[in-house]
Curated annotation (Swiss-Prot):
Domain of life, per lineage: Eukaryota
EC number, UniProt record: 3.2.1.14
CC terms in the record's Gene Ontology section: extracellular region
Pfam families assigned: CBM_19, Glyco_hydro_18
Ranges where the GH18 domain occurs: 27-318
Family to which the UniProt record says this protein belongs: Belongs to the glycosyl hydrolase 18 family. Chitinase class III subfamily.
Protein name as catalogued: Chitinase 1
CDD domains tied to this protein: GH18_hevamine_XipI_class_III
Catalytic-site annotation from UniProt: E164 (proton donor)
GO BP term (any one): polysaccharide catabolic process
Gene designation per UniProt: CHI1
Enzyme class: hydrolase
Keyword vocabulary terms for this entry: Carbohydrate metabolism, Chitin degradation, Glycosidase, Hydrolase, Polysaccharide degradation, Signal
Signal peptide range: 1-20
Length: 493
């Protein structure tokens, strides 16, 4: 009896391990790996340990975070590869990772390299720089040759553009040039508000294989109810993307500590995956930030793999080809009370000209300009529409978004999602200044100190130099309505 049980477990484990393999036509489960965002000394396993788990189809090495145009780029894999630089360079030599890449590929798991990330310094000043960098990437990581290949003779399967900051200049030229070198999987990781502030024009210009849409740290997160906007991305994939067969990945946090907001437990995520896969033929699976978080989250990784592949198998290809319905749950960009005198009802179907513009209706719903027509949708349960609760500020150097994640009993929680729009990253010490209404009082933030005198707020942050950051705030409102900070008052220094 004991022998039978052991044999059964062994066979089950073998079957599971053989199931994990990348599918070009079906769904996949992708994990970002390398940064050990869980933060513990033993929270991140080796690359090969994930590839042999039977619960990963694609691994994304994170990150190549410094382009260093005119020289060699830099990679950062946290504790997975440290202080082993090629002589007289800042480029890591990681032979163990290289060996693991080849083992992963022999098991059918694709290995990609992510360019960018929140921390680093990257971007192009021209298309020619993008084309030159494509040659660099091909020689260092692809099928080219170089004396300074970080992973030796291992050849990655593609790249992921996780461009959190900078400008869009040069990326379309980079992708086009890299495509000309040979077969590479190429994707991008835009944030879910549509269109993405930096990658929007890039993904409209060149055909990609997938987009890892970040459905977290934004109002359109997977956990936001009717604000979740996968339908908008499906619409883009089918009607505007140069590659009409592009896969839209549902990118989520691997645990509650993996992101500032937007985490959905596996119990919550299961029905969402089943719903998305049944409605949208562009659905390509689930991507997770990151492996260290998911593997330390009470079986999240194993249940997720079963959910994604189980939903796909149960549904079958015929059901997956069902046309997606008319948009009814478009992303909202704000949460605040509405006055019909100030925010008149914008009737669904009427013409509009400002893509993605959002306003509240007099009934407490919200309406968004979607491809020339106003579309109205209800707010999530327990939430009312606040037309001024998000402020968007774009100056010459920063694009910032302020939105409310909860508002009840006079208390609120909010997020500032800031992205650099130049090639120079934010410095280690940062200051944010803005003006709030008289009845709003900020009390806490996760990265620094809040100083408020009357309506004037100053937040001093101490963080790593980075291209983007997410700041969690909380405070109180002595009013029944929340009004956002004045967009014209935002200052970043």
């Amino acid at each position: 009896m004991i022998s039978c049980n052991i044999l059964g477990i062994t066979i089950a484990a073998f079957i599971t391990s053989t199931l994990a393999a990348y599918s070009s036509n079906g769904v996949n489960v992708m994990y970002y790996w390398g940064q050990n965002s869980a933060g513990g000394s033993n929270t991140q396993g080796s690359l090969v340990s994930y590839c042999q788990s039977g619960q990963v189809d694609v691994i994304i090495l994170s990150f190549l975070n410094k382009f260093n145009m005119g020289g060699l780029p830099e990679i950062n894999l946290a504790s997975a590869c440290e202080q082993t630089f090629f002589p007289n360079t800042n480029l890591l030599h990681c032979p163990t990772v290289g060996s693991d890449i080849k083992t992963c590929q022999s098991n059918g798991v694709k290995v990609l390299l992510s360019l960018g990330g929140a921390a680093g310094s990257y971007g192009f000043s021209s298309d020619s720089e993008g084309q030159t960098f494509a040659e660099t990437i091909w020689n260092l990581f692809g099928g080219g040759t170089s004396d300074t290949r970080p992973f030796d003779d291992a050849v990655i399967d593609g790249i992921d553009l996780d461009i959190e900051g900078g400008s869009s200049t040069g990326y379309a030229a980079f992708v086009t040039a890299l495509r000309s070198k040979g077969h590479f999987l190429i994707g991008a990781a835009p944030q879910c508000p549509f269109p993405d502030a930096i990658l929007g024009s890039v993904i409209d210009a060149v055909g990609l294989d997938f987009v890892n849409v970040q459905f977290y740290n934004n109002v359109c997160s997977v956990a936001s109810g009717s604000s979740f906007n996968f339908d908008v991305w499906n619409d883009w994939a089918k009607n505007k993307s140069p590659n009409k067969n592009i896969k839209v990945m549902l990118t989520v946090p691997g645990s509650s500590t993996a992101a500032g907001s937007g985490y959905a437990s596996i119990a919550e995520l299961g029905p969402i995956v089943s719903s998305v896969i049944s409605q949208y033929s562009s659905f390509g699976g689930v991507s997770v930030w990151d492996a260290s978080q998911a593997w330390n989250n009470n079986g999240f990784h194993s249940e997720l793999y079963s959910i994604v592949h189980g939903s796909s198998a149960a549904l079958g290809q015929a059901a997956r080809k069902t046309p997606f319905p008319n948009t009814s749950s478009i992303t909202t960009t704000s949460l605040a009370t509405a006055s019909s005198a100030l925010f008149p009802l914008l009737y669904a179907g009427r013409s509009c000209s400002s893509q993605s513009k959002v306003s509240c209706t007099s009934t407490g719903s919200y309406t968004i300009c979607n491809y020339g027509k106003w579309v109205t949708a209800p707010c999530p349960p327990g939430v009312i529409c606040l037309s001024s609760a998000q402020s968007n500020n774009t100056d010459l150097t920063v694009s910032a978004q302020f939105f409310i994640t909860s508002f009840a009993g006079g208390s609120f929680k909010a997020i500032i999602n800031a992205r650099r729009t130049t090639l120079t990253p934010f410095e280690k010490m940062k200051t944010i200044e803005f003006t709030v209404p008289d009845h709003v009082r900020l009390s806490q933030c996760n990265l620094g100190k809040i100083e408020q005198v009357g309506r004037s707020v100053r937040i001093r942050l101490k963080d790593h130099p980075n291209m983007a950051f997410v700041l969690n705030l909380s405070g109180n409102v002595s009013s029944d309505a929340f009004v956002a900070p004045d967009p014209s008052s935002w200052r970043f220094s």
